[in-house]
Amino acid sequence: MSSLYIKTPLHALSAGPDSHANSSYYDNLLLPSFSNLSSNISRNNITTDNNINSASPRKYSFHSLNVSPILSPISLANEILGKKSNTAPASPHHMDYNPISSLTPGNSPEFNKASLSQISFTNPLNYGSGLGFSSNSQPRLPLLDRLSSVSLSKRPERPQQSLPSLRHLQLLPSPLLQENAARFPDTSKRTSNWKTDLTHWCKDTNYQDYVKIREEVAHFKPLSIPNLTNNQNNDSFNYGKELESTRSSKFHSPSKESFDRTKLIPSILEAKDQFKDLSNNAWSITPPVTPPMSPPTNRTMERTTLRGVEASFFEGKSSNNDSIFNPIISEKLVQEVKHQRQLRGNSFPMPNASHKKTNSFKALQIKKLLANRDILSNNSKSNVRKPSKNKISKQASNVFGNTARQLVMKLDNASYSSVSASSSPSPSTPTKSGKMRSRSSSPVRPKAYTPSPRSPNYHRFALDSPPQSPRRSSNSSITKKGSRRSSGSSPTRHTTRVCVSCHSSDSPCWRPSWSPRKQDQLCNSCGLRYKKTHTRCLNDLCRKIPTKGEINIMKSNGIDKEFVPERNCEIEGYRCLFCNYITETVEN
């Protein structure tokens, strides 16, 4: 056998041109395992000389690592180590790929070389006893000197059963039908002794994994969470007691306090209640402080520091000393704010001093009206007094007690009963005492048009309408003669503009229409549509201006002709979608 390895070169192992296709690129580096040689020799019962002549192609299997390969003797080993051309190339991509003998980290050539120092050679020699090998005639392998010296004894390993996978559990689509749940305690119904069931099941299935789990759990200290399992069902609690009593003789079950301190795993069949064991107290240690309350004293701070944080978080009943969190503002604070506002309002001497700045039109007009209240009546100058700094007059307090609208209505009724007819539109009017009182011209008092023959000597304040511009108010006639003169000389310009299409009189702006007359205008909406489409209905009762979408529908219906009596001619155009009359489109 030794002469076989010495005299046979590397190229003799190939059996023709087909041997390269059946072997991988590293077959020249590794020799077949000794078990394959012994099995082939014992099965064929041929001699060593016949083995030299038989050159059949060999298929080497590198997937099994249980049997160690036998290295070549010194001559062949030196030939392998001496020739650099026989070494494997840097990249195997240029060689033919064989999926059967693919490289893995476990079956690489480097791994097989390193495994020689860890596997004993006593067992493989027993397989080669038929070839005349013995422990004394074992050749000396030079590659062992180059490897690290490790003990050649291997401890026999007992095959361990791996834990079954959870893929066999049919969790979806119906979690209620769990046929395999009894085999896996971690997916079964939650009980008080789920931890013991899981640990014992791991111990019976795989003892080494159970030892690892036990070592890891020994360093873990569960959090002390009291009163977490108080609301459990009595059935599950009794069931846990029975199982602990039955297994106490065989296993060392932990105490009940350790179960109470650990959180229970949520079951698949029963969803976890997210609102369970929540407290009504605040999560902050110190209670919130509102302005009516006093800040926490030293006694309350000592009480909060001595109290356990975990007890305050998970207690079902709040103690009497703790203040319950209330998000609503206290009534005492509301009354205090009202009182402070009343004191602040009474302390101001002027009535408009406490009025805040506002952009409201009504509020500004009321403020101006109250500031000029001395000219609202004929005898107001002698009766109205300026309020003192410390005390407000009785009349001013009565005015502020009523609303603004009631104040204006009362002033209007009083003025109609006491007003006198004026024959001239002079700015000054005589009073009963014969004295002339000059009317102060105020730019903030707008003038409204009153067609009544009698005009009061003060302006009626319009609360709901904005003030007119000075240009428009100057055009309006104040007296009877002025109105007659204006009506006799020129027509009134107070004509209401109406849209010629939709007959609307309210529009933010007016746009030109198809009519050459300037009075015929369109509102903003109709003007924008006519600017885009340039189409209008010729029916005087309709005059609808279509939109762009309506124009497309009208175009799909086709062009039609119709005689229009107003124009005394036949017009060609589209049909109106609203009245089915002919329309006119003006080209730009």
UniProtKB/Swiss-Prot annotation:
Role: Component of the RPD3C(L) histone deacetylase complex (HDAC). Responsible for the deacetylation of lysine residues on the N-terminal part of the core histones (H2A, H2B, H3 and H4). Histone deacetylation gives a tag for epigenetic repression and plays an important role in transcriptional regulation, cell cycle progression and developmental events. ASH1 is necessary to repress HO in daughter cells to block mating-type switching through its binding to HO promoter 5'-YTGAT-3' sites. Also involved in pseudohyphal growth.
The organism of origin for this protein: Saccharomyces cerevisiae (strain ATCC 204508 / S288c) (Baker's yeast)
Keyword annotations: Chromatin regulator, DNA-binding, Metal-binding, Nucleus, Phosphoprotein, Repressor, Transcription, Transcription regulation, Zinc, Zinc-finger
Leader sequence segment: none
Biological processes per GO annotation: chromatin organization; negative regulation of mating type switching; negative regulation of transcription by RNA polymerase II; positive regulation of pseudohyphal growth by positive regulation of transcription from RNA polymerase II promoter
Subcellular location(s) of the protein: Nucleus
Assembly: Component of the RPD3C(L) complex composed of at least ASH1, CTI6, DEP1, PHO23, RPD3, RXT2, RXT3, SAP30, SDS3, SIN3, UME1 and UME6.
Biased composition (Low complexity): 417-433, 470-493
Keyword Membrane: no
Record's GO cellular component terms: cellular bud; nucleus; Rpd3L complex; Rpd3L-Expanded complex
GO-annotated molecular function: cis-regulatory region sequence-specific DNA binding; DNA-binding transcription repressor activity, RNA polymerase II-specific; zinc ion binding
Further details from the record: The ASH1 mRNA is transported to the daughter cell before cytokinesis where translation produces the protein to block mating-type switching. The ASH1 mRNA 3'-UTR and the mRNA localization machinery that are essential to restrict accumulation to the bud. Present with 1800 molecules/cell in log phase SD medium.
Residue spans of biased composition, Basic residues class: 383-392
Entry protein name: Transcriptional regulatory protein ASH1
Cited CDD domains: ZnF_GATA (cd00202)
One Pfam entry name: GATA
Residue stretches of biased makeup (Polar residues): 99-109
GATA-type zinc finger locations on the chain: 499-526
Xref: InterPro entries: Znf_GATA, Znf_NHR/GATA
Segments of this protein annotated with the region Disordered: 85-109, 377-398, 417-495
